[in-house]
Regions:
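Conserved alpha-helical positions within TPR/SEL1-like repeat arrays
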Residues: 4-19, 52-67
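Charged/polar positions within long, soluble alpha-helices
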Residues: 42-45, 66-69
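Short coil/turn connectors between adjacent alpha-helices in alpha-solenoid helical repeat scaffolds
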Residues: 1, 18-32, 67-75
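Flexible helix-coil transition and linker loops at the boundaries of alpha-helical arrays
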Residues: 1-6, 43-50
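Small-residue (primarily alanine) positions within well-ordered alpha-helices
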Residues: 14-16, 33, 40
């Protein structure tokens, strides 16, 4: 698998975990989404012509982190 395909797959897995977390309120899914997005960002950062994807994934990661912080504040 090429790095680009791996990063795309990691991003897709992160998006799926994020969607499930919003429906189930399971923190472990948010943590998994964050890890997937972070991995995808690292790879996209190394590839040429992927700045836009990196930016979109970083925004998704920020949303996940905000939800995790909200959960910590509520506890």
């Amino acid at each position: 698998m090429t790095p680009l395909l791996w990063a795309q797959t990691s991003n897709n897995l992160g998006a799926a975990c994020f969607a499930l977390a919003k429906r189930t309120n399971e923190d472990y899914l948010l943590q998994e989404a964050a890890a997937c997005f972070q991995g995808a960002i690292q790879v996209f950062r190394q590839l040429r012509g992927q700045k836009k994807r990196e930016k979109v994934i970083a925004q998704n990661l920020l949303r996940v982190e905000q939800m995790l912080n909200e959960d910590e504040d509520a506890a």
